[in-house]
């Protein structure tokens, strides 16, 4: 099953997440199919906190991909901002 989820990157105490489309059997930071955006929870000031390619997310959802709980919240936030 294909899932759209967060893959943690960044340094210790400085999380940075890639939003990826991956097979649910792969590890969270392992092999992925496509990168559709990023989420920076520690963004301050003029830094971009969220970038998401909504067209690609909608494409994958139409193909049967499921969203993780946190990614579903981020998609809702991105749709409000767009």
From Swiss-Prot:
Which InterPro entries does this one have? Ribosomal_bS16, Ribosomal_bS16_CS, Ribosomal_bS16_dom_sf
Sorted keywords for this record are: Ribonucleoprotein, Ribosomal protein
Q: Does the keyword Magnesium apply?
A: no
- Cystine links in this protein are none
Parts of the chain that traverse the membrane: none
Any one GO MF term held by the record is:
structural constituent of ribosome
Q: Which SUPFAM superfamilies match?
A: Ribosomal protein S16
As recorded in UniProt, coiled-coil segments are none
Swiss-Prot/TrEMBL GO biological process terms: translation
* Keyword hit for GTP-binding: no
Protein name per the record: Small ribosomal subunit protein bS16
Please name the gene that encodes this protein.
Answer: rpsP
């Amino acid at each position: 099953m294909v899932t759209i989820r967060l893959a943690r990157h960044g340094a210790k105490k400085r999380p940075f997440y890639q939003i990826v489309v991956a097979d649910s059997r792969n590890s969270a930071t392992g092999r992925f199919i496509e990168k559709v955006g990023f989420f920076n929870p520690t963004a301050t000031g003029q830094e971009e906190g969220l970038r998401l390619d909504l067209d690609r997310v909608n494409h994958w959802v139409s193909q049967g991909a499921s969203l993780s709980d946190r990614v579903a919240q981020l998609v809702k936030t991105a749709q409000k901002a767009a």
